[in-house]
Design a protein with these regions (language model features):
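Active-site phosphate-binding/coordination module
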Residues: 1-93
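Conserved acidic, metal-coordinating active-site core of Asp-based
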Residues: 62, 66-69, 73-188, 192, ...
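Conserved residues at beta->alpha junctions
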Residues: 7-10, 50, 129, 154, ...
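Glycine-rich beta-strand-to-loop/alpha-helix junction loops that act as flexible
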Residues: 33-34, 188-190, 203
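Short, well-ordered alpha-helix to beta-strand connector turns
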Residues: 26, 122-123, 201
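Basic, amphipathic juxtamembrane/active-site segments
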Residues: 1-2, 206-208
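Short, well-ordered beta-strand core segments
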Residues: 29, 204-206
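Residue-level detector of anion-binding/catalytic polar loops
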Residues: 4, 69, 149, 203-204
Length: 208
């Protein structure tokens, strides 16, 4: 009927649950909060809005000012450190999210050095906090930069993306590529990082 069902997620595509990745009829996906718009059938990136390598290193180094666990998404993979992955309870991460993190992170000795060594732009950076005051301080500092988008999908995290990387902007860019008017789009979401998509779609539906 000409209707495209498009998963929009903060995750990388390989981190999306298998039942959704294998659902018949899924051709396009918007991943890492809109940093990547891709044709998942053809394994082709259609649009990307990433943090520069230099920006990403600054944001990862900023994390060291706070008591936070962090990771980075580079070239379709998520990288984390053992010092964080073995102590996720300290950052108030629910068991279900811990399981997902263990399944999707590639362990490296030093995330910052990994990003520096690749020299590649970064799709997204996550911060996780056990202390809400620390989270609020970090959010303020990040927003004061003026060159990143800060959102969250959990009560204890911050998700940092480059300019133009939001689910809403990703939705509108994909719609434009497919010749679909904004008024003909609909978005469903239940998280803070869904707000731009719900606002920008022709019809936005907030789920509880």
């Amino acid at each position: 009927r000409g209707i495209y069902v498009v998963p929009c997620t903060g995750r990388i595509w390989s981190g999306v649950p298998e039942f959704l990745r294998t659902l018949p009829g899924i051709q396009y996906a918007i991943t890492t909060n809109g940093a990547i718009v891709e044709d998942v059938e053809k394994h082709k990136i259609l649009d990307e809005r990433k943090l520069s390598c230099a920006q990403a290193i600054e944001i990862l180094e900023l994390a060291e000012k706070f008591r936070t666990m962090y990771d980075a998404y580079v070239d379709g993979y998520a990288y984390g450190e053992r010092r964080f992955l073995e102590h996720m309870d300290e950052y108030a991460i629910p068991d279900t999210i811990q399981n997902m993190i263990h399944q999707t992170r590639r362990e490296v000795p030093d995330v910052i050095q990994k990003v520096r060594d690749t020299g590649l732009p970064v799709e997204k950076i996550n911060y996780f906090f056990g202390d809400q005051q620390e989270r609020a301080r970090a959010r303020r500092e990040l927003q004061e930069r003026g060159d990143v988008i800060v959102s969250s999908s959990l009560d204890n995290n911050l998700e940092i993306n480059g300019p133009g990387a939001s689910k809403g902007e990703g939705l509108l860019r994909l719609a434009s590529m497919l010749g679909i008017r904004r008024e003909e789009t609909m978005a469903f979401g239940d998280g803070n990082n869904d707000a731009s998509m719900i606002r920008d779609a022709g019809i936005g539906v907030v789920m509880e």
